[in-house]
Amino acid sequence: MSSVLDRILARKREEVAEGRRSSEGFGDLEPSDRDFRAALAAPGRRFILEVKKASPSRGAIRPDLVLEELLALYDLHADCVSVLTDEEFFGGSPGDLKEARRLCRRPLLRKDFMVDVWQIEESRHLGADAVLLIAAALGDGELRDFSARARELEMDVLFEVHDEEELRRVLDCGADLVGINNRNLVDLSIDLQTTSRLRSLLPDDVLCVSESGINERNDLQSLPADAFLIGSSILASEDLDRKIKELVYGPVKVCGITRRADAQAALDLGATWLGFLFHPPSPRSVTVEQAREICRALPGRKVGVFVDQNPDEILSIVHQCDLHGVQLHGNYDSEAVRYLETRLQGVFLVEVFSAESLGSFEESRADYQLLDAAPQGEGGLGESFDWARLQGRDLSTVFLAGGIHPANALEAQATGVYALDLSSGLESEPGIKDPTRLAALFDKLRAGQEESS
């Protein structure tokens, strides 16, 4: 029985033969002007996000994909973009790559099954800055010839390998960028240990990209790679924006939003949620009218933060501002919480617990729990508690707040909480977000490591 790869390659050779016969040539090809490898060589974790409508392992993933909408998100959050151009098995087309060149500023990888040097030239003609060469599909001579032609066009080459022998072959061809595919191309199974096993054999000056099987941000922690190529888990998600942000940065709520400009900046940089405080004594408080204007003008998910407000008043504000979540500070008894739960259809509930009552949060019936150093009130005091106290607890639905800022955000994330909640640590003054601090936060979370001194 032939493997999936064998079937794809047989069909690809037929397609290329047809393409060559009908082609009038590509004329004088302009060299690539976007440095694919350099984008992945930046410190910390880097991300190649993929345009993919289907795959042999999953069938149709997102057949109704709107390329312009997806690429607008990738332009904000990807380091590079991979475009699958195989039509029969992956639902793509060469036209997708050409359109991506027009719509996207990021370096572009043409991901297809290269069987002829003609495809390298076609790739540059379509706008690719790099091509994928699969070691399992090519002989040594083809690997050398195809990569040489790509480099003549100042394109980078991502050499894809699955085992030690393939890795040896591509290194002999001078590979400086290696993609380790965690998927077995014979039976389509996934083994994330493939990256760990092969990475140890790479020279220090060769960049490593981990491919396939990356579904959650936690998967990144165990993969010793410089960059990650992710497609299916994003495209299979109902909420593309949220999935991309949670993979690249982890879930983050930016709270205490008072201005539309701050809200827009937070969303563009990577915030999963925006938090609006309805508590007049606080300098971060907003009126219902202010919040409604921002919430209805911008995309993204919004959370209302309430301090001892009447439950019916909370419900009214939720509907007026189209909120996605409600966060309760203060003294809400179990009856008030149940009252809100039964009436908040499609709106999640966050119950707040102080460090003083750490032992009781696991009994909460709310969708999420928020842990803060502040004993009562609306938070935003810039104080933290000893996060070591969280060890051994189930934190899968927990937001961590209090004293989190760009310099300690990775430490906070490393506690294993579901999400981070930041407010004063991102401000130039109460209620005013500092764009430099916002950018520093998401840069740090994206890289996943402390900057070297």
Where are the predicted features?
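An N-cap/entry alpha-helix motif that binds or orients negatively charged groups
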Residues: M1-D64
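N-terminal small/glycine-rich loop or linker at the start of catalytic domains
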Residues: A39-A60, S93-A100, R144, P203, ...
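Short beta-strand/loop segments at the ligand-binding rim of alpha/beta enzyme cores
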Residues: R45-F47, R101-K111, R149-L158, L201-E211, ...
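Glycine/Thr-rich beta-alpha phosphate-binding loop at enzyme active sites
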Residues: K53-D64, E69-F90, V170-S200, W273, ...
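N-terminal active-site wall of soluble small-molecule enzyme domains
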Residues: S57-R151, M155-L158, E164-R169, L177, ...
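Catalytic cores of alpha/beta
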Residues: V115-G127, H162-C173, S210-I230, T258-L269, ...
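Glycine-rich phosphate-binding active-site loops on the catalytic face of alpha/beta enzymes
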Residues: E122-E142, G179-S189, A225-L247, A271-P283, ...
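C-terminal helical cap(s) of enzyme catalytic domains, especially alpha/beta-barrels
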Residues: L192-L202, I234-V252, V288-A297, Y339-L340, ...
